[in-house]
Amino acid sequence: MEAVLVAMSVPATTEDDGFSLITDKLSYNLTPTSDVEIVTSDNRRIPAHSGVLASASPVLMNIMKKPMRRYRGCGSKRVIKILGVPCDAVSVFIKFLYSSSLTEDEMERYGIHLLALSHVYMVTQLKQRCSKGVVQRLTTENVVDVLQLARLCDAPDVCLRSMRLIHSQFKTVEQTEGWKFIQEHDPFLELDILQFIDDAESRKKRRRRHRKEQDLYMQLSEAMECIEHICTQGCTLVGPSNVVDNNKKSMTAEKSEPCKAFSTCYGLQLLIRHFAVCKRRNNDKGCLRCKRMLQLFRLHSLICDQPDSCRVPLCRQFRKRGEQDKKMGEDTKWKLLVTRVVSAKAMTSLCQSKKNKCEQAQGV
């Protein structure tokens, strides 16, 4: 059966090994001009031109440079055997070498075979297209087979996407024949897959833990702003302790307006009021709520950049204590906490600034 190729023109060049690219329009219908025959698994013979094959594939070029073997019935034509794949896949492969065209139907039918051929014969353009096409057609049924081929064909993108699909649908993939096959015949691949899944789960846990930590630092950053806001301006329940306002009505009106972070601010107000009247604060056993408030006061003192004029209670006292701890080398954990809280505050400010700009742009 004679395959049909799209006609194309090829620029003429001269090679040291004795063969040159053909400058006429090429097609399989012009069998007298062909000087190569591609033999497939079922002995189908596909006529081709050495110049075109050599220009499209460095592997085929090396084959052309070797001394030609004589085969009965082939005359003076060079014979190249491409075995191990369907004959139609070979026809599509040769057609691509001529025309660089590949239909979706051909990709659907022979994508895996074309990926193997493009790797063996080093046809980069075809390999890239096949990699994308094979990835788009991955299913739980074929993913293990595709992964095995991708490893052999040095297709890292296909390997990665296959691994991710196996990870996300592992329970389904476990029931497939492909998985059962590698369990019996390729334990190293099975181990690699399980290792990939384990690493992916570990990364997911680390990301989840990191998000929780970032949320905590964001909350602490918000708490620091609320403490300063409460002790400087006052809020619904608590006002500044060292500011006397003769206009009580205006003071009440100012306090009655809740701040933006009301839930955090309200909780801190309750803590501050408890801290002010708690009798167990100085006991040996102590008070858990008071200890928490003291820790927040200490964190504020380490972040505060205006300790002399700060109205937050115990700010200057903790500042002096922090300097003593620094000399003794006992502030490492607090220093790390301050760094992360300050970073979280900077990120929050940046996000808020971008949000405000977007809102202004939309308003305009």
Swiss-Prot record:
A zinc finger (TAZ-type) spans 215-316. Pathway: Protein modification; protein ubiquitination. The keyword Phosphoprotein does not apply. Preferentially expressed in young leaves and roots. Disruption phenotype: Altered response to auxin. Blocked ability of TAC1 to induce telomerase. Hypersensitive response to both sugar and abscisic acid (ABA)-mediated inhibition of germination. GO terms for molecular function: calmodulin binding; zinc ion binding. Residues 327-350 are annotated as: CaM-binding. A motif (Nuclear localization signal) lies at residues 203-212. GO terms for biological process: abscisic acid-activated signaling pathway; auxin-activated signaling pathway; circadian rhythm; embryo sac development; pollen development; protein ubiquitination; regulation of DNA-templated transcription; response to abscisic acid. The BTB/POZ domain mediates the interaction with some component of ubiquitin ligase complexes. Interacts with CUL3A. Interacts with GTE11/BET10 through the BTB domain. May act as a substrate-specific adapter of an E3 ubiquitin-protein ligase complex (CUL3-RBX1-BTB) which mediates the ubiquitination and subsequent proteasomal degradation of target proteins. Plays a key role as a component of the TAC1-mediated telomerase activation pathway certainly by targeting a telomerase repressor to degradation. Seems to occupy an integral position in a complex signaling network that perceives, integrates, and responds to multiple, and sometimes competing, signals. Enhances responses to auxin in postgermination and vegetative development. This is BTB/POZ and TAZ domain-containing protein 2. It comes from Arabidopsis thaliana.
